[in-house]
Curated annotation (Swiss-Prot):
GO biological process, one term: DNA-templated transcription
Function: DNA-dependent RNA polymerase catalyzes the transcription of DNA into RNA using the four ribonucleoside triphosphates as substrates.
This protein's name: DNA-directed RNA polymerase subunit beta
Reactions catalysed: RNA(n) + a ribonucleoside 5'-triphosphate = RNA(n+1) + diphosphate
Keyword flag Magnesium: no
Assembly mode: The RNAP catalytic core consists of 2 alpha, 1 beta, 1 beta' and 1 omega subunit. When a sigma factor is associated with the core the holoenzyme is formed, which can initiate transcription.
GO cellular component terms given for this protein: DNA-directed RNA polymerase complex
Recorded GO MF terms: DNA binding; DNA-directed RNA polymerase activity; ribonucleoside binding
Enzyme kind, highest EC tier: transferase
CDD domains xref list: RNA_pol_B_RPB2
Keyword Nucleotidyltransferase attributed: yes
InterPro entries the UniProt entry points to: DNA-dir_RNA_pol_bsu_ext_1_sf (IPR042107), DNA-dir_RNA_pol_bsu_external_1 (IPR019462), DNA-dir_RNA_pol_su2 (IPR015712), DNA-dir_RNAP_su2_dom (IPR007120), DNA-dir_RNAP_su2_hyb_sf (IPR037033), RNA_pol_bsu_bac (IPR010243), RNA_pol_bsu_CS (IPR007121), RNA_pol_bsu_protrusion (IPR007644)
Enzyme nomenclature, EC number: 2.7.7.6
Length: 1342
């Protein structure tokens, strides 16, 4: 393949055997697309804001005389951009304005005559906007809305699997779940009666629902049963015969016809008997009269002469009844066909327990169940039932629900509306009875065809609709009050409920989460997370094993590896690499179509529902050059996800890629196929906790997923359009755009501003560094600047470290690690952490708090780092306890001592009416102040420091805009110059005149003259735009800040802390191999090889076999080979060997193995080869894709090429004695991460601190400055040693003996070291609790 200029800087050699059919899709699609659909005006109004408005409007007054109609909406421009919102602590949102029309009808005139129309734009609150990276800025912090996996609307058939009843009988049930509205359940009880529940309330016989729908007993029976006809002829009883119905029964009498006995009495009726009966076309047989006894009448029988009801429908027929019927003149009797095998009498039985007799009684019964205690009226009962399932306002199945419903009941897909029909309800009951009769299957609720994804847009729309409905109620009430003469839509609408609903969702919903911003991977993963928790989802406590387990339909949709350990395991999942949601919200994954054993280029996305019908081959099936399967039998997933062997011609689809199964984080683990799943899970989760190091270092052994993740995460800067780098410094990059990519009439300059040293949500440091040089060509979509944890546009979470697997004096016992001092000296794992501390000055009852350097009772030295406004200088190095912002709070009048009275009398001032409430550096933190921001409320005078900061910001803004103008003007004048030269003006003439005068030239060619005039206009426009932008910037900087009520000033101080690695820090590899640093060892004591090169980390080999993560060993070997090749290249450069030799050697490295990648260095210029070699000096980056990685032979080949032992083991010497270790040791390069569990954040000690109110025991935890818990096991330990006094001290004076501890303090101060233990407070608590039970318990103190 052809590489672009910047791709040629460093090419990662890939071992992937299969060419990439489909590029990795944009990883944040699920977030961006979903919200885009919400915000956009949809033409059909099926989703988003438009749909919400259309579903609520028009709002008609109760008397129908006025209505408020919705016309359209528009979103304004946000006031501040994303960056400004973060600094100011506001929400990045756009105002929503809706055009509404108030129509008044003339009530006297004919219906529909309009009397008056008022149209107006109404403000309806603010809608938060999504940033380009799929996040929201809410109150200044970046948040992510996690997608939810919930049960799809539709109908589900399920069983209790025999767990409910003691007999173990399986009870079946059906549940209709709408998108919004009441749930309707049908269920069998152990006696086989069918019951219904509405909204999971108490159950009613299901036939009540049918009666409420208006069906009579006769209609109900005819809907659910087949009939059998009996004829009475000359005292004989003849039965109409349907032979098929007799299958499996035992003949209770001889079955004979036309004198031939077909089945003798007591014999079982078989298929042969049925065939003979059918062949002889027997339509009727004679049966004994007793046979009809116990059968059930299918309809009402009325004595036609008297009109009296002889036998009601659903009545069992007895001999007397038979006599009555024949007396009444009935020659034919219809009964229900039932049997024990597959036609149960369930509905008939249920009708017998049903207390109702007609529609009204059924409606009343339902009303009583839904609204117990209210007196039912006919109207109320009807309205309640109608509103429940048949009103579009209250009930909506949604398109998805209707689709699932129709599929389940085998109806046509597109038919039906969002509400239920009579046929829908009877259809569900029929199917449930079929399942009870043994025909049909119950649904699997964990199947991904029955669970769908609800993304940001949909959830925001639901919240918005809730807000609108609240507004609707208020508007309807207001419209019904009458007196609408001078009223406008603006007066009717109160935007508060809407903005409150939206705000609540974005600010405090369970699915709106504080973005995990440790590193680019954690951001991407967080946005691709799928949670089963949240509103309308599951709860941790109720979720069983089945829901959490991996399901066959997860294949290619949800990752089977990446999920948290702990109570949320399996409830929070991650989207697989290629997965996406379809229009209905179901997850789908791509496959290549296979036709007659030939794999085509066509790619189709299948959802879990569709996938079940096809045979699908795996991505690593063997194909020949014509894309035909080479094996006679291919391993495939067949129907129902079961694996099996199939012939090539039976295959329908083939997987797209080997990494289709896993998520983004799991796809970053090289040799994943050699790791145990549990360890891979830890590896995937721990990569998200890696802290960005000071100098990012790309992994030598990667998987090829590093580039897409770094690009899509949005932390790096990507070129919007191709061009040439015109200027570059640490804070901005200017690109002159290629002619063919510019829009006619623009300057053709792109300016990219870099983010410098800002704080992330996790207090890590975000900083962007340019990685292009002046004059370099860049193409669209290429990387211009690296962000945190990226290296030349590749994700770089850790460092490549030389490791050895060997024990070393117990320092790597139980997963600890021995680290060389060199790692610390070279700052390999040094990280920068930025903390934000803020000081708020409020208006209190006693007066305003003041930020000042004049603090009572504080020495000069403590104020040395503050300026005259009382705010710390930027650049000051501070440690725990130092004052950052001086602040005093007025305190109430206290009783004055005589001395103070004297002072007041002399100096006549209030010397002590304020107390010190300054912002200090928390204990245990130290660092450098890198930034200070002051926010002042409108109308409060700004202090000197605030004015200085303002001035500086104005200068910066002006400088930025001036530079931007200069760059744009330069671009413009280049075009003017070229135009003039083409138009016949000589260069010498142009150079004599000032640039501005060029625009006044006149040219002979009219077209060129027009162009010149256009350019002059553009220049004028540029100037105006500059002035406009400057003015906007100025206003933004100068205007007062919008602070919380009662707040006058906020000062934010940013501290940067540089943390080197130290014992107690947690580190990990990518294979779940985590550990804690036990010791930093001097370089000279570390084991070294024959060349004197020491290893950097010593790991314990015993951590590998039992954990079964062999991937780390293979990574180590391959890392050694990569480094070996880098060393060879380095040596060649140092020896100044010819470019041809370098080219040949590098080409050899790229050609090694059987990968599908081809790199042809002969197309590179010498300069490009040299630059590539320069970038490969530290090692040749390799990619071993998941499930398609390097083979052992390839690793050995690379080791040979790097002139290293193919065993991957090296003889090492002990650094302290110089002796050789007794056997070769596995040495190589492993990619190690430093995790965000730093010992500095966990170390904590307490001397005196706060106590719990009730128990009077010290609080727990570092945040509360708590003590160490002395639990029951610790008590046992002291008891075991008989340390009675120590134990007494622990349980009394060191804990909750209030008097004892004060005395103890006094004794220590007095120098008498004695302890007087008293009564622990927790004993008193126990006393009180016993008294609370009503038992009077006294303590007799002797």
């Amino acid at each position: 393949m052809a590489y672009s200029y910047s791709e040629k800087k460093r090419i990662r050699k890939s071992f992937g055997k299969r060419p990439q059919v489909l590029n990795v899709p944009y990883l944040l699609t699920i977030q961006l697309d979903s919200y885009e659909k919400f915000i956009q005006r949809d033409s059909d109004g099926q989703q988003g804001l438009e749909a919400a408005f259309r579903s609520v409007f028009p709002i008609v007054s109760n008397n129908g005389s006025t209505e408020l109609q919705y016309v359209s909406y528009e979103l304004g421009e946000p006031v501040f951009d994303v960056r400004e919102c973060q600094i100011r602590g506001t929400t990045y949102a756009a105002p929503l304005r809706v055009k509404l029309r108030l129509v008044t009808f003339d009530r006297e005139a004919a219906a529909g005559t309009v009397k008056d129309i008022k149209e107006q734009n109404v403000y309806m609150g603010e809608i938060p906007l999504m940033t380009d990276n799929g996040t929201f800025v809410i109150n200044g912090t970046e948040r992510v809305i996690v997608s939810q996996l919930h049960r799809s609307p539709g109908v589900f058939f399920d069983s209790d699997k025999g767990k409910t009843h003691s007999s173990g009988k399986v009870l079946y049930n059906a549940r209709i779940i709408p998108y919004r509205g009441s749930w309707l359940d049908f269920e069998f009880d152990p006696k086989d009666n069918l019951y219904a529940r509405i909204d999971r309330r108490r159950k009613l016989p299901a036939t009540i629902i049918l009666r409420a729908l208006g069906y009579t007993t006769e209609e109900i029976l005819s809907m659910f049963f087949d009939k059998v006809n009996f004829e009475i002829q000359d005292n004989k009883l003849l039965m109409t015969l349907v032979p098929e119905r007799l299958r499996g029964e035992t003949a209770a009498f001889d079955i004979e016809a036309n004198g031939k006995v077909y089945v003798e009495r007591g014999r079982r009726i078989t298929a042969r008997h049925i065939r003979t009966l059918e062949k002889d076309e027997i339509k009727q047989i004679e049966v004994p009269v007793e046979y009809i006894v116990g059968k059930v009448a299918a309809k009402d029988y009325v004595d036609l002469s008297t009109g009296e009801l002889v036998c009601p429908a659903n009545m069992e027929i007895s001999m007397e009844m038979l006599a009555k019927l024949s007396q009444a003149g009935y020659k034919e009797i219809e009964v229900l066909f039932t049997n024990d095998l597959d036609h149960g009498p369930y509905i008939s039985e249920t009708l017998r327990v049903d207390p109702t007799y007609d529609r009204l009684s059924a409606l009343v019964e339902i009303y009583r169940m839904m609204r117990p205690g209210e007196p039912p009226t006919k109207e109320a009962a009807e309205a309640l039932f109608d509103n429940m399932f048949f009103s579009a306002d209250r009930y909506d199945l949604s398109a998805v629900g209707r689709m699932k419903f129709n599929r389940s009941l085998n109806l046509e897909e597109g038919v039906g509306s969002g509400i239920l029909s009579n046929d829908d309800i009877t259809g569900v009951m029929k199917k449930l009875i079929e399942i009870r009769n043994g025909r049909g299957e119950v649904d699997d609720i964990d199947h991904l065809g029955n669970r769908r994804i609800r993304s940001v847009g949909e959830m925001a729309e639901n919240q918005f609709r809730i807000g609108l409905v609240r507004v609707e109620r208020a508007v309807r009430e207001r419209l019904s009050l009458g007196d609408l003469d001078g009223i406008t839509p603006q007066d009717l609408i109160n935007a508060k409920p809407i903005s409150a609903a939206v705000k609540e969702f974005f600010g405090s919903s369970q699915l709106s989460q504080f973005m995990d911003q440790n590193n680019p991977l954690s951001e991407v993963t967080h946005k691709r997370r799928i949670s089963a928790l949240g509103p309308g989802g599951l709860t941790r406590e109720r979720a069983g094993f089945e829901v959490r387990d991996v399901h066959t339909t997860h294949y290619g949709r949800l990752c089977p590896i990446e999920t948290p350990e702990g109570p949320n395991i399996g409830l929070i999942n991650s989207l697989s690499v290629y997965a996406r949601t379809n229009n209905y919200g179901f997850l789908e994954t791509p496959f290549r179509k296979v036709v007659n054993g030939q794999v085509t280029e066509d790619i189709e996305y299948l959802s879990a529902i569709e996938e079940g019908n096809y045979v699908i081959a795996q991505a690593n099936s063997n194909l020949d050059e014509n894309f035909r399967f080479t094996d006679t039998y291919v391993t495939c997933r067949g129907e129902h996800g079961e694996s099996g062997l199939y012939k090539p011609e039976d295959i329908h689809y083939m997987d797209i890629s080997t990494q289709q199964v896993v998520s983004v984080a799991a796809a970053l683990i090289p040799f994943l196929e050699h790791d145990d799943a549990n360890r891979a899970l830890m590896g995937a989760n721990m990569q998200r906790q890696a802290v960005p190091t000071l100098r990012a270092d790309k992994p030598l052994v990667g998987t090829g997923m590093e580039k897409p993740i770094a690009l899509d995460s949005g932390v790096a800067i990507v070129a919007k359009r191709g061009g040439i780098v015109q200027r570059v410094d640490a804070s901005r990059i200017v690109v002159k755009v290629n002619e063919d990519e510019t829009i006619p009439g623009e300057a053709g300059i792109d300016i990219y501003n870099l983010i410098k040293y800002t704080r992330s949500n996790q207090n890590t440091c975000i900083n962007q560094i340019p990685c292009v040089n002046l004059g370099e060509p860049v193409a669209r979509g290429e990387i211009l600047a690296d962000g945190p944890s990226t290296d030349l546009g590749e994700l770089a979470l850790g460092q490549n470290i030389r490791v050895a697997f060997m024990p070393w004096n117990g320092y790597n016992f139980e997963d600890s690690m021995l680290v060389s001092e060199r790692v610390v000296q070279e700052d390999r794992f040094t990280t920068i952490h930025i903390q934000e501390l803020s000081c708020v000055a409020r208006d209190t009852k006693l007066g305003a708090e003041e930020i000042t350097a004049d603090i009572p009772n504080v020495g000069e030295s403590a104020l040395s780092k503050l300026d005259e406004s009382g705010i710390v200088y930027v650049g000051a190095e501070v440690k725990g306890g130092d004052i950052l912002v001086g602040k005093v709070t007025p305190k109430g009048e206290t009783q004055l001592t005589p001395e103070e009275k004297l002072l007041r009398a002399i100096f006549g001032e209030k010397a002590s009416d304020v107390k010190d409430s300054s912002l200090r550096v928390p204990n245990g933190t130290s660092g450098t102040v890198i930034d200070v921001q002051v926010f002042t409320r409108d109308g409060v005078e700004k202090d000197k420091r605030a004015l200085e900061i303002e001035e500086m910001q104005l200068k910066e803004a002006k400088k930025d805009l001036t530079e931007e103008l200069e760059i744009l003007e330069a671009g413009l004048f280049t075009r003017v110059r070229n135009l003039l030269i083409e138009g016949g003006v000589s260069e010498a003439e142009l150079d004599k005149v000032a640039r501005e005068k060029w625009l006044e030239q006149t040219l002979d060619d009219e077209a060129k003259q027009n162009q010149l005039e256009q350019l002059a206009e553009q220049h004028e426009e540029l100037r105006k735009e500059f002035e406009r932008k400057l003015e906007i910037k100025r206003n933004k900087i100068i205007q007062g800040d919008d602070l919380a009520p009662g707040v006058l000033k906020v000062v934010k101080v940013y501290l940067a802390v540089r943390r080197q690695i130290q014992p107690g820090d947690k580190m990990a590899g990518r294979h779940g191999n985590k550990g804690v640093i036990s010791k930093i060892n001097p370089v000279e004591d570390m084991p070294y090889d024959e060349n004197g090169q020491p290893v950097e980390i010593v790991l314990n080999p015993l951590g590998v076999p039992s954990r079964m993560n062999i991937g780390q060993i293979l990574e180590t070997h391959l890392g050694l080979a990569a480094k070996g090749i880098g060393d060879q290249i380095n040596a060649m450069i140092k020896q100044q060997q010819s470019v041809a030799k370098l080219r040949e050697y590098i080409q050899k490295a790229y050609d090694l193995g059987h990968g599908s990648q081809s790199v042809d260095l002969s197309t590179f210029t010498d300069e490009e080869v040299m630059r590539l070699a320069e970038n490969l000096r530290k090692g040749l980056p390799l990619a071993t894709p998941v499930f398609d990685g390097a083979h052992e032979s390839e690793i050995k080949g690379l080791l040979e090429l790097g002139d290293l032992p193919t065993s991957g083991q090296i003889t090492l010497f002990d650094g302290r004695t110089g002796e050789k270790f007794e056997r070769p040791v596995t040495v190589g390069y492993m990619y190690m991460l430093k995790l965000n569990h730093l010992v500095d954040d966990k170390m904590h000690a307490r001397s005196t601190g706060s106590y719990s109110l009730v128990t009077q025991q010290p609080l727990g935890g570092k945040a509360q400055f708590g003590g160490q818990r002395f639990g029951e096991m610790e008590v046992w330990a002291l008891e075991a040693y008989g340390a009675a006094y120590t134990l007494q001290e622990m349980l009394t004076v060191k804990s909750d003996d209030v008097n004892g501890r004060t005395k103890m303090y006094k004794n220590i101060v007095d120098g008498t070291h004695q302890m007087e233990p008293g009564m622990p407070e927790s004993f008193n608590v126990l006393l009180k609790e016993i008294r609370a039970l009503g038992i009077d318990m006294e303590l007799d103190e002797e």
